[in-house]
Amino acid sequence: MKKNIVVSCMFLVVVVSFISVVVIIRNKTNAKENLVLAQKQTEIKRGEAGRISDLNFYQKLHQKKDINALIVGDSIAQSTGTSNSHEKWINVVIKDVQKKYRSTITTDPITGGSTTGVRAWVELNNAKLTKQYDVVFICLGQNDQYNIKPKQFRMFYESIIIKLKKLNPNIEIIPIIESSFRQYNDYSNVIEDLAEHYNLQYADTVGAFNNSGKLYSYLSNDLVHPNGKGYVYYAKTIEKVINNNYLSNKKTDIDYSVLYNNTKKLTDFVFDNSPDLNNGFTIENGFIGNKVSENLTFNTTKSLAIIHFLRKPKGGKFKVFIDDNFIKEINTNSTFQVSYSDLIAYNLRGNHKIRIEISNIIKKGSVKILGLVTN
C-alpha cells in the first residue's frame, strides 16, 4: 500500500514537473512571438510614418492627412486688424481646407508684429522646431520697405526659403505679397523673382485688393492692416493658390541654386551671447542695462552683424559703434514686448569691435540686449 502511494506521488511529481516545463517553454515561445510581433508592428508604424513624411502638402491633402503649417511673418501674418479670431485669414483657410479636402491644419507662428526679413531669419535659425512642417506661409515686406534696402531684403528672404527647404525638402512655401504695399514695388518684385526661381506660387493680395472694386479704406481701418473684410481676400487668394496646385499635383521637392550672390553670406548662423567686454550690464537671460553709458563690446571677424534685442514698454535707446565710428541709434521702447533684430552691417572685412552703448533710459526702464548675430 505504502509502495503504491510512493509510486503515485512520484508519478504526480513527474506530471507536475512536465506540465511546468511545458508551460515555461510555451511562455517563452509566446514571449518571443509577441516580441517579434511587436517589432513587426513597430516597423510597420515606422514605415507608415516615413511614407507619410515623404508626402508633400498636396499629396497629403489628396489622402486627407493632417497638415502641419508654419507662419513666418509680421502683424499681417497675425491678422492684426480683425475684430475676432474667426476673421483671421489663417483660420478661414483652415476652415476651407477642412471642408474641401477633409484635412486638419495645425499652425505654429514664428515672429509677429513689426517683423522684418532680418528678424524672421534670426528667429527661424534660433527656433528649436520639433515638427516636420508641410507648408509655410511667408508674410513679409511691409516693415522691410522702411528698414532695409531691397538688395538686403532679397538675401534674407532667400535665406529663409533655403533654411525651410533644408528642414524639409518636400515643404511647400507660399509667399504672400502684402496688400499694404498698395502698389507693386522693389520689395514685391523680390518676392516674385524668388517665387519664380524656387517654383513657388505666391498669393498676390495687392492684385486682389486692387481688383476688388473696393476702396482700400473699406478693406482696412488703419490703411495698413486689413480688417475682417480685407482678410477675406487674403484667404481667398491663398485658397486659390492651394487649389490650383492641388489640381496640378504640384511637385515640391526640387533642385535649386542660389539666386542672389549675397545670400551666400548667410549660409552660416552664429548667435554670440558672450560679449568680450561688459561695462555695467546685468546678466539675466541676456544683458540688462539701466544707466546711460553702460556698454557691451563684441569682437568679430565676420562680414555680418545683427543686434538682437528686446523691444518693450519702459525701454530706452542705445547707440551702435563699429571701431568707435557711430553707426546708428536704436529705440527699444514699444507698447508691447517682442524680440527684434536690427541689421548693423553685412560687408565687414577684417577685425572689428562692435560697441553697444546706452544713450537714453525711460524712467524706471531698461535696455535688454540678447546677443550679436554673425555669419
Describe each model-derived feature in a short phrase.
Residues 184-265:
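Catalytic His-Asp segment of secreted/periplasmic serine-dependent ester chemistry enzymes
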Residues 40-109, 126-129, 306-309, 348, ...:
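Serine-esterase "nucleophile elbow" of acetyl-processing enzymes
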Residues 119-154:
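Oxyanion-hole/transition-state-stabilizing segment in secreted/luminal serine hydrolases
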Residues 243-375:
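Glycan-recognition surfaces in beta-rich domains, encompassing non-catalytic CBMs
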Residues 110-115, 137-146, 178, 210:
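Cell-envelope and extracellular/periplasmic
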Residues 161-193:
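Active-site segments of SGNH/GDSL-like serine hydrolases
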Residues 1-14:
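N-terminal Sec-pathway targeting helices
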Residues 27-44:
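Ser/Thr/Pro/Gly-rich low-complexity linker/stalk segments immediately outside membranes or between
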